[in-house]
């Protein structure tokens, strides 16, 4: 007796799936096979040892980047719109917040759509020059974001630690800082175009970044020096600023408690004390934002150092996570500032009432204000 099997849609799908599995295990195929010939000169020989990635990973990455890009562009776009159209939010310090949102917005505008398309095609499809521009954009906007956050930390330090003795920031001062941030970032970004390292496809072949697999130590030195000025130095400066911010607030709170004991009262809740409490809360919010940024970029830094030091193998799948975490930082900032800034919330709900889920009129809610706003309300004697 013979048994015949109807080759219906289910059986055809099973055969297709089996052929894909066989392809992934076929040593004759590599992750580079889908790359166009004009891109091959940018790809390191190291990646030829890896088989093609499962299309599921490309689909998952493309979907995730698409969602993150939409959230980031909407969130940062709202931050820019609200801060620039609300009179009591147009302060010198808040210009730094707008610059941060602007940098994050441009990052996702430049990188998210391209990566979604590449993930759909399972390889880079825009050619070598676009690959270089893509890597350039990631470097430029990433550097601008972290140094903007560093300037925000210095602004907090100047007001909270130095108090009324601090020289208040002016609009010209804020604009000068922003101009310096972009000039500094651009200088680091264009260096690979002049021979100090280069921008090449990542191992997943859907994104581009610096060449951390090069054997040339002159090119490797770019990654080392870049990480010093764009990762480690800002990190130390931010830690320094917030260390003294926490110290100043802690000393103030201790003095307030001692004074309350002398006056035989439960606490002293003057306007100044309330403002200090607000500044303390905002310092925590800003510190959380910066911590999230470093959490986002650290995986990519680790991948770069692993490559130049050849300390461990790097798989194409690992480069996916580096790209994903790096781009996710553009989503954090509008969420954190939107939650923590009641004047931003009030302006947002006034323009978009549908976004208001509940009333935030309690004293506790209103006390969690942005340090940038508090700074501008303090006397500048």
UniProtKB/Swiss-Prot annotation:
Name of this chain's protein: Ceropsin
Entry's localization field: Membrane
One family name in Pfam for this protein: 7tm_1
Function: Visual pigments are the light-absorbing molecules that mediate vision. They consist of an apoprotein, opsin, covalently linked to cis-retinal. May play a role in photoperiodic photoreception.
Molecular function (Gene Ontology), one example: photoreceptor activity
UniProt record similarity statement: Belongs to the G-protein coupled receptor 1 family. Opsin subfamily.
Gene name tied to this protein: Bcop
Tissue expression summary: Expressed bilaterally in dorsal and ventral anterior protocerebral cells and bilaterally in the dorsal posterior protocerebral and lateral posterior tritocerebral cells (at protein level). Expressed in the larval brain but not in the subesophageal ganglion or thoracic ganglion.
Keywords: Chromophore, Disulfide bond, G-protein coupled receptor, Glycoprotein, Membrane, Photoreceptor protein, Receptor, Retinal protein, Sensory transduction, Transducer, Transmembrane, Transmembrane helix, Vision
Disulfide pairings: 131-208
Transmembrane portions of the chain: 63-83, 97-117, 134-154, 174-194, 222-242, 285-305, 317-339
GO cellular component: membrane
PANTHER family in alphabetical order: OPSIN
Extracellular topological domain residue ranges: 1-62, 118-133, 195-221, 306-316
Glycosylation sites: 28, 121, 204
Cytoplasmic side: 84-96, 155-173, 243-284, 340-381
